[in-house]
């Protein structure tokens, strides 16, 4: 009791909560503080627990009064009166651990106490508050899930449309497949040639870069050696200054010579630095050359496409010129044949007039037959749509009935298991009760025999 995970509510707050959220009608009006504290009424507590269990487990009132009919019970009239209380005990033993109340006892329902009732009801109220907040979050998740499903459907539809467009764009028409294969083979050959040239140039540049790096390392090594020599010479100069006393002229000539050597060393150092900068620029240029080559490759590909377009245009122009020459020749031959055909046309026109009359009659008959066939097809299509709708409706009803059947089977199976558990518990309790009754009857019979024997002894004494 000291390690609760929920507060103990006052009796007045509990009464207000159950009036507003659990009880209805006259039950809410007649429910007051004295029903649960300090001396709870068992019938009111049982009714309150029943209403709470109805709301939590979605049970009907008739389910609390149901007695399993598939069990062989010795005294069914006793079970009928005890069925609601047994169902309440079973469900409360299952429900209260969810509310963090682990010390439930059947006496809390059969003979409730004030403090234990407040403890249990406070845990139930805390659980109901928590379930209400979680229910709101669950509904929000459901709404977001529905919107996400709708977005997924839209995206799938857009994806399918995009795939259809991609397939249309990627497929090559049959009349252009030969040309496409030829162009792809030419492009592949050009890419191989370009890649081979690029590899050769790349190898040459890499060799030059490696050579420049080795030269640069040698120059740096020489420069470091010269720096070390200058430092040693300066140290030697300082050491010799302290040991040798020279004339001013000799000292001046030596200092001039040393200045000249220092100047030469500085010039050599400057030259090496310039060469280092030059080689560094060459290395950077070699690194940048790769991006330029890639750009040149792209430009070459663009030039190849432009050349291909130019070749196609030239072929079309040549083909059109050939067609023009052929058409001129045909025009000359046709001009000769024109005179002959004019005479033939006059004869043919007369025949065509007769044939046109016959064709008009046939066309009218054909249009009439076509219209009749279209009307019959439209009627058949309407009937087909009606039948299809009926079939879809019947299939939907079948699916619904199958789902309801499965749900009903699951609920009946669960109810059957629960009833069997209650009956086994109740049978064990009845067997214990029968044993106790039998023992009590045996004890009373023994006492009766003892009293009769004592009375007989007293009567015999008299």
From Swiss-Prot:
One of the GO biological process terms: meiotic chromosome segregation
One of the record's GO molecular function terms: protein-containing complex binding
Spans annotated as Disordered: 239-259
Chief localisation class: nucleus
Gene3D superfamilies: Ncd80 complex, Nuf2 subunit
Keywords noted in UniProt: Cell cycle, Cell division, Centromere, Chromosome, Coiled coil, Kinetochore, Mitosis, Nucleus
Biased composition (Basic and acidic residues): 248-259
Compartment(s) where it occurs, according to its Swiss-Prot or TrEMBL record: Nucleus; Chromosome, Centromere, Kinetochore
GO cellular component assignments: Ndc80 complex; nucleus
Residue runs in coiled coils: 143-277, 308-461
Family: Belongs to the NUF2 family.
Function: Acts as a component of the essential kinetochore-associated NDC80 complex, which is required for chromosome segregation and spindle checkpoint activity. Required for kinetochore integrity and the organization of stable microtubule binding sites in the outer plate of the kinetochore. The NDC80 complex synergistically enhances the affinity of the SKA1 complex for microtubules and may allow the NDC80 complex to track depolymerizing microtubules.
Complex formation: Component of the NDC80 complex, which is composed of ndc80, cdca1, spbc24 and spbc25. The NDC80 complex interacts with mis12 and zwint.
Annotated protein name in UniProt: Kinetochore protein Nuf2-A
């Amino acid at each position: 009791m000291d390690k609760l995970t929920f507060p103990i509510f006052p009796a007045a707050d509990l009464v207000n909560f159950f009036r507003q959220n659990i009880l209805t009608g006259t039950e809410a009006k007649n429910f007051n503080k004295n029903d649960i504290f300090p001396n709870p009424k068992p019938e009111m507590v049982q009714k309150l627990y029943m209403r709470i269990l109805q709301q939590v487990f979605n049970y009907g009132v008739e389910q609390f009064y149901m007695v399993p009919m598939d069990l062989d019970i010795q005294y069914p009239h006793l079970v009928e009166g005890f069925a609601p209380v047994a169902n309440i005990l079973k469900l409360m033993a299952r429900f209260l651990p969810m509310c963090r109340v682990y010390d439930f006892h059947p006496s809390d329902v059969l003979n409730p106490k004030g403090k234990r009732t407040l403890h249990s009801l406070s845990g139930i109220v805390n659980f109901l508050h928590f379930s209400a907040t979680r229910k709101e979050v669950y509904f929000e998740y459901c709404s977001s899930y529905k919107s996400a499903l709708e977005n997924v459907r839209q995206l799938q539809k857009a994806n399918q449309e995009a795939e259809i467009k991609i397939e249309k764009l990627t497929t090559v028409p049959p009349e252009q497949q030969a040309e496409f294969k030829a162009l792809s083979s030419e492009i592949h050959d050009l890419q191989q040639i370009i890649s081979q040239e690029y590899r050769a140039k790349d190898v040459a540049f890499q060799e030059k870069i490696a050579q420049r790096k080795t030269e640069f390392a040698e120059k740096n090594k020489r420069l470091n050696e010269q720096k070390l020599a200058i430092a040693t010479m300066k140290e030697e100069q300082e050491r010799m200054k302290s040991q040798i006393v020279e004339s001013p002229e000799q000292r001046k000539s030596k200092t001039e010579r040393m200045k000249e050597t220092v100047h030469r060393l500085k010039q050599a150092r400057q030259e090496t630095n310039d060469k280092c900068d030059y080689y560094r620029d060459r290395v950077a240029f070699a690194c940048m050359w790769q991006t330029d080559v890639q750009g040149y490759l792209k430009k070459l590909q663009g030039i190849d496409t432009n050349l291909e377009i130019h070749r196609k245009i030239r072929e079309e122009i040549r083909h059109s010129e050939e067609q023009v020459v052929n058409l001129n020749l045909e025009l000359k031959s046709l001009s000769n044949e024109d005179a002959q055909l004019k005479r033939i046309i006059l004869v043919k026109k007369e025949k065509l007039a007769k044939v046109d009359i016959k064709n008009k009659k046939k066309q009218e008959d054909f249009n009439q037959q076509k219209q009749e066939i279209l009307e019959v097809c439209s009627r058949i299509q309407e009937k087909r749509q009606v039948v299809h709708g009926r079939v879809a409706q019947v299939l939907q009803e079948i699916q619904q009935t199958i789902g309801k059947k499965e749900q009903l089977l699951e609920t009946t199976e669960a109810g059957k298991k629960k009833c069997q558990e209650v009956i086994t518990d109740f049978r064990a309790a009845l067997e214990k009760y029968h044993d106790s009754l039998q023992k009590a009857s045996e004890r009373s019979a023994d006492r009766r025999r003892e009293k009769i024997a004592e009375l007989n002894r007293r009567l015999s004494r008299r």
